[in-house]
Amino acid sequence: MSILIDKNTKVICQGFTGSQGTFHSEQAIAYGTKMVGGVTPGKGGTTHLGLPVFNTVREAVAATGATASVIYVPAPFCKDSILEAIDAGIKLIITITEGIPTLDMLTVKVKLDEAGVRMIGPNCPGVITPGECKIGIQPGHIHKPGKVGIVSRSGTLTYEAVKQTTDYGFGQSTCVGIGGDPIPGSNFIDILEMFEKDPQTEAIVMIGEIGGSAEEEAAAYIKEHVTKPVVGYIAGVTAPKGKRMGHAGAIIAGGKGTADEKFAALEAAGVKTVRSLADIGEALKTVLK
């Protein structure tokens, strides 16, 4: 088992013929992902990377039976791309694009909830179930099928956790980058709930960062509902207050959202926290005895 995606997931790409869509679709195909086509308005009826191109998501879904879409569309047009995917009946949307206006995301979030559609992102690396399906921009070769579920607000820090779990021989069930924006399609709790139910996942690594209250909310959820061991790390311990650190959501505002507060919340919930990414492997060794 795994969560969200597996070897049978049929995937289309929106923004398929652009440079990002092309490069990452090539990588996904090489990894073994079941890419079945792509969407670029005006280029319908052509082929790209040996796959059919469609003008609309609805046409792509009708022709291919795709259930997942990955979006590499410039930020100003992303809202329409997501709404189009929802309207076409796509059940899993993975939005890689960074810089989508917050107001656009408010509209999108309402529509996602109304339609019961799961979205990962925006501003995220995507989702990978090692050895089966890779949707996003992750380096496939560092992953290894296994028993640790990883959920993170950061892309590159996810890869650090992956490398450690691979090097220590644990491997990963599924890795989910939920993204670094203030309004994500899915939050920590959504993914923790899935990992808790997934029989393949024996432990969870959760990587948070300063800003917002997502980690504190996740800690409260873990305390009540998660029986599997969780290893937690928070990025931004030395971040100055009021300065945005890379991600739009990574800012300590009004004295709230500091790394220390988040570490304290996780520790109070029984999470095994580490103060350095380099300690994740060792921490997992202690909780997976």
Swiss-Prot record:
SUPFAM superfamilies: NAD(P)-binding Rossmann-fold domains (SSF51735), Succinyl-CoA synthetase domains (SSF52210). Gene3D superfamilies: NAD(P)-binding Rossmann-like Domain, Succinyl-CoA synthetase domains. Its EC number is 6.2.1.5. The keyword Coiled coil does not apply. InterPro entries: Cit_synth/succinyl-CoA_lig_AS (IPR017440), Citrt_syn/SCS-alpha_CS (IPR033847), CoA-bd (IPR003781), CoA_lig_alpha (IPR005810), NAD(P)-bd_dom_sf (IPR036291), SUCC_ACL_C (IPR005811), Succinyl-CoA_synth-like (IPR016102). Substrate binds at Y159. CoA binds at T17, G18, S19, Q20, K43, I96, T97, E98. Signal peptide: none annotated. Exhibits two interesting properties: 'substrate synergism', in which the enzyme is most active for the catalysis of its partial reactions only when all the substrate-binding sites are occupied, and 'catalytic cooperativity' between alternating active sites in the tetramer, whereby the interaction of substrates (particularly ATP) at one site is needed to promote catalysis at the other. The keyword Lipid biosynthesis does not apply. Pfam families: CoA_binding, Ligase_CoA. GO terms for cellular component: cytoplasm; cytosol; succinate-CoA ligase complex (ADP-forming). Belongs to the succinate/malate CoA ligase alpha subunit family. Heterotetramer of two alpha and two beta subunits. Succinyl-CoA synthetase (SCS) of E.coli catalyzes its reaction via three steps that involve phosphoryl enzyme and enzyme-bound succinyl phosphate as intermediates. Succinyl-CoA synthetase functions in the citric acid cycle (TCA), coupling the hydrolysis of succinyl-CoA to the synthesis of either ATP or GTP and thus represents the only step of substrate-level phosphorylation in the TCA. The alpha subunit of the enzyme binds the substrates coenzyme A and phosphate, while succinate binding and nucleotide specificity is provided by the beta subunit. Can use either ATP or GTP, but prefers ATP. This is Succinate--CoA ligase [ADP-forming] subunit alpha. It comes from Escherichia coli (strain K12). The lineage of its organism: Bacteria, Pseudomonadati, Pseudomonadota, Gammaproteobacteria, Enterobacterales. The gene is sucD.
